Amino acid sequence: MVKQLKFSEDARQAMLRGVDQLANAVKVTIGPKGRNVVLDKEFTAPLITNDGVTIAKEIELEDPYENMGAKLVQEVANKTNEIAGDGTTTATVLAQAMIQEGLKNVTSGANPVGLRQGIDKAVKVAVEALHENSQKVENKNEIAQVGAISAADEEIGRYISEAMEKVGNDGVITIEESNGLNTELEVVEGMQFDRGYQSPYMVTDSDKMVAELERPYILVTDKKISSFQDILPLLEQVVQSNRPILIVADEVEGDALTNIVLNRMRGTFTAVAVKAPGFGDRRKAMLEDLAILTGAQVITDDLGLDLKDASIDMLGTASKVEVTKDNTTVVDGDGDENSIDARVSQLKSQIEETESDFDREKLQERLAKLAGGVAVIKVGAASETELKERKLRIEDALNSTRAAVEEGIVAGGGTALVNVYQKVSEIEAEGDIETGVNIVLKALTAPVRQIAENAGLEGSVIVERLKNAEPGVGFNAATNEWVNMLEEGIVDPTKVTRSALQHAASVAAMFLTTEAVVASIPEKNNDQPNMGGMPGMM
């Protein structure tokens, strides 16, 4: 494909036009009085949202140079979303401010490399100051405040707070679409996997069609059980203990399944057979998780173990197991705490190392099941458009809340960035490095300025007053009042604010040091000649 090139000022100005188009579409959403953006969807109803990264991902510009500029800011939003899960609009506003101010200085003759050094220096000091001003999230109310501010909805904050209280900070909280109008919270305690009983005759409660096992033994194996004789010695030991047994195997079939059902119906013993969860390597890993949680030994050929030789001390135990047609839930497994903690640490390491979003999601689910449970927030709304918008807001709020628990909180509404202004202004530098520091100083005020403008106020007036205010005191754009942001619960997670600033600075520095841009020339579709026809035909 043929390429076209642009150099120096021409290249940067073309990319700046793309930056501005994307940033201008995103920044109208920031703050409590921010607006929504409507996104056209080819095969479904339009999506109405105020989620920065969702808007940024939709933007594709016709001009290749402008599109490259837009893609750079998209990268800021994506990276911030990936690391912190929220703050994408703030990151976009910061990036635009740094790029615009930096480009003015480059055009005036400043050296981009010196500017980059100044930007890096200023951001390092700003991040250190943010951490100094950060406060730990201590209780349920503070967690609810973070969620409520992010979603602009107190009810959502409350749901997230309750969910985190029940499943722990490492617990999985999933967001699903509900068929009703109301949003609800449902918590599944213990380890649950999506496999049910292999025969309805195994149920203990025929009204609910549920098998409930109290203090059961748990057999965990990756083998297929076809012969009843293979497990008979083990079942005889279980019968003597007068306790039920849950059999988790690759499959229980034929003679083995028939005899388990017959003995259950005769009242000889209570046994429930379920298929092992997952597939392939993931199945082995999930069986190991279950074994560690319950204190069982996985009966597998990999370890040279055979079902005929299995003894009762190879079985796991739990306080309760509930099996439905579709799911099995193991509550309060009796596994060794140290082994469980070691497994949790191992999973956390794998989550950090993996580059696949799908693998990360599955690892997080496994971590949650070991750590305590799964909470499901079922989102309800009156229309599909409202449902999708509400779901996006809840996802952002959940990510914000997790970030707050991890690194603490700072004053919200852009106040935290202005609070570090003084520290950054004290940096001693000269020449282009000093100019780079000044670029960051101006950008630190950009989010507050935009929040004020979205509320119909003069941003410059708000910024100047905020610079002279006590640390933590800020402008509440929802009520047009000056308040102590932390006391009022108007907070941002430190991680979100930090990530937004760092990623914006990184992309701005790359932009300013760009001297040439190479783009593909779009191929023109030549009109196809008319097909020749028979005489007399058109």
Swiss-Prot record:
ATP binds at residues 29-32, 86-90, 413, 476-478, 492. The keyword Transmembrane helix does not apply. Its EC number is 5.6.1.7. The keyword ATP-binding applies. It catalyses: ATP + H2O + a folded polypeptide = ADP + phosphate + an unfolded polypeptide. It holds the Pfam family Cpn60_TCP1. CDD domains: GroEL (cd03344). Together with its co-chaperonin GroES, plays an essential role in assisting protein folding. The GroEL-GroES system forms a nano-cage that allows encapsulation of the non-native substrate proteins and provides a physical environment optimized to promote and accelerate protein folding. This is Chaperonin GroEL.
